[in-house]
Amino acid sequence: DGLVWPTVRVDEAYREGLDAISLTEHIEYRPHKKDIIADHNRSYELSQKQAKKLGILLIRGSEITRSMPPGHFNAIFLNDSNPLEQKAYKDAFNEAKKQGAFIFWNHPGWARQQPDSTLWWPEHTQLYNDGCMHGIEVANGGLFMPEAIQWCLDKNLTMIGTSDIHQPIQTDYDFSKGEHRTMTFV
């Protein structure tokens, strides 16, 4: 659902000094489906050559995009994103798990999905117990979710910070003022 070509994301990452990037296109939400073929690996394939040229580690990933609960999750370190397109969300998660993906819950405090509060649902407990949740996004652009930090501490989950950018990066961040994307240090 991004508004820039995948190689542009790699170029942006290089200019910002990042070592790795994952382009996690939505599996279920495809606002440009009339114009773009639904091969969920295509963004990765298009940007591989540029990433290699610039020395950027490109991580194959996709976003499992469901209503709450369970919400939106990224699965990274996939072998093939296409099998994640499943009717039942549990089947999509099990496919990601089968591929050895690292799966994390995106923006649990996003007002579009949880307008009144940030809640941990029974579906999240099930995903966690099934080994289908390894982390939680605690920061997403300007969105900060303190509840998610506590859940990570309580459940020994990885804390993630991401940019979740859909348009050119300079649209969201003013580099001349020292602003930068949210990121995870590894």
Question: What is the predicted role of each segment?
Answer:
Residues 11, 48, 123-126, 174-176:
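Homeobox/homeodomain signature
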Residues 57-58, 137, 180, 185:
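Catalytic-core segments of hydrolase enzymes
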Residues 70-74, 113-122, 146-152, 169-186:
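Histidine/acidic-residue-rich catalytic or RNA/ligand-binding cores of hydrolases
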Residues 1-102, 106, 131, 138-168:
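A metal-dependent hydrolase metal-coordination microenvironment
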Residues 124-128, 158, 171:
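A structural motif
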Residues 110-147:
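Active-site-proximal segments of metal-dependent phosphoesterases and phosphodiesterases across multiple
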